[in-house]
């Protein structure tokens, strides 16, 4: 441990073996809170390398319980969080709608650290059992195309380090790791990052971990695809990386102001979610979610492009099927 800390203090990248040892220490609680704080801050100041992020994710996945093999090309749209902008739960609402359209969504997430409402906070307040056991998760995913994997259940290091990480008042390598360590190993991912500079690193990390199709995005400083600003995207397609910018025009949607997406409580996010699912949400809320669903449809080859994905989603919302689908998910999660 001393050697690893000294290397980090001198701003040297750790090799794969050092990262594996370090995260094994963290998993086995062989690191004191003081040491963990020093490690996270040193990594942050140095800048986490692609190889460090990939090796840490691989180590955490090796130690995580394996829920089951679904036999499906699962999709996740978990983001890093940490943008601090306190918006509605765009990705979680998008996952619920996408699953109601038949996309197999294995949503990996946790409670909020920097916002009013994380994915677990929203789903729990909607009535979903966020701590599904193996049988419940498998059945819910099979019957509703939606399953929620509460990160602390599968990665104890996340749960035990959460209070310390919150006290650091900064993003850490754990923000980057969250979207990479879904125990069900999805093959398709839409991943939002809190900083545009992470887009290339994270899409390469997904590729290294075996993901086949992905898009890593940062929209106007948020870890989402947005309509109020340019969204920078790095796409993994046919084993190649494509880098480009997206605007509202690419979705054939109008722009909206960021302020219209910001909330003050989890209750506001819950109401926004229910309104969107019933096709009576604010346009600013609905359209940004639609853009994210469209991207999931595009990545899964259900839509030939983003504009077609938008049209498909808007037509689906008119049926109000997503709201009925949520009730099914709630019931199955407790069955």
UniProtKB/Swiss-Prot annotation:
Binding site for 5-phospho-alpha-D-ribose 1-diphosphate: 79, 82-83, 87, 89-92, 107-115, 119
Catalytic activity: N-(5-phospho-beta-D-ribosyl)anthranilate + diphosphate = 5-phospho-alpha-D-ribose 1-diphosphate + anthranilate
GO MF annotation list: anthranilate phosphoribosyltransferase activity; magnesium ion binding
Gene3D superfamilies: Nucleoside phosphorylase/phosphoribosyltransferase catalytic domain, Transferase, Pyrimidine Nucleoside Phosphorylase, Chain C
InterPro entries with a match to the protein in the record: Anthranilate_Pribosyl_Tfrase, Glycosyl_Trfase_fam3, Glycosyl_Trfase_fam3_N_dom, Glycosyl_Trfase_fam3_N_dom_sf, Nuc_phospho_transferase
UniProt: anthranilate 2 binding residues: 165
Pathway: Amino-acid biosynthesis; L-tryptophan biosynthesis; L-tryptophan from chorismate: step 2/5
Domain of life: Bacteria
Residues the record lists as binding Mg(2+) 2: 223-224
EC class of the enzyme, as a word: transferase
Cofactor(s) for this UniProt protein: Mg(2+)
Free-text function comment from the UniProt entry: Catalyzes the transfer of the phosphoribosyl group of 5-phosphorylribose-1-pyrophosphate (PRPP) to anthranilate to yield N-(5'-phosphoribosyl)-anthranilate (PRA).
NCBIfam families: trpD
Assembly and binders: Homodimer.
Family under the similarity heading: Belongs to the anthranilate phosphoribosyltransferase family.
Name of the molecule in the record: Anthranilate phosphoribosyltransferase
């Amino acid at each position: 441990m001393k050697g690893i800390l000294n290397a980090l203090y001198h701003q040297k990248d750790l090799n794969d073996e050092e990262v594996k040892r370090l995260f094994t220490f963290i998993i086995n609680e062989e690191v004191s809170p003081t040491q963990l704080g020093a490690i996270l801050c040193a990594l942050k100041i140095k800048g986490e390398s692609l190889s460090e992020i990939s090796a840490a994710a691989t180590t955490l996945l090796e130690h995580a319980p394996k829920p089951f093999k679904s036999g499906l090309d699962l999709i996740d749209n978990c983001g890093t969080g940490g943008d601090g902008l306190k918006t509605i739960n765009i990705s979680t609402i998008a996952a619920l709608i996408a699953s109601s359209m038949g996309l197999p969504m294995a949503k990996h997430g946790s409670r909020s650290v920097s916002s009013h409402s994380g994915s677990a906070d929203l789903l729990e307040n909607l009535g979903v059992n966020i701590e599904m056991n193996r049988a419940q998760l498998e059945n819910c995913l099979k019957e509703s195309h939606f399953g929620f994997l509460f990160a602390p259940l599968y990665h104890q290091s996340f749960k035990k380090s959460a209070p310390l990480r919150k006290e650091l008042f900064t993003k850490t390598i754990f923000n980057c790791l969250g979207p990479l360590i879904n125990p069900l190993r999805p093959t398709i991912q839409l991943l939002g990052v809190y900083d545009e500079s992470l887009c290339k690193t994270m899409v390469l990390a997904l590729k290294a971990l075996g993901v086949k199709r992905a898009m890593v995005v940062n929209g106007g400083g948020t870890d989402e695809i947005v309509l109020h600003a340019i969204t920078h995207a790095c796409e993994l397609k046919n084993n190649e990386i494509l880098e480009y910018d997206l605007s509202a025009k690419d979705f054939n949607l109008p722009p909206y102001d960021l302020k219209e997406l910001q909330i003050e409580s989890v209750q506001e996010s819950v109401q926004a979610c229910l309104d969107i699912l019933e096709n009576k949400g604010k346009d600013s809320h609905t359209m940004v979610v639609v853009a994210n669903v469209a991207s999931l449809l595009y990545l899964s080859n259900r839509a030939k492009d983003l504009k077609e994905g938008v049209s498909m989603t808007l037509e689906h919302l008119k049926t109000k099927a997503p709201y009925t689908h949520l009730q099914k998910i709630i019931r199955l999660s407790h069955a």
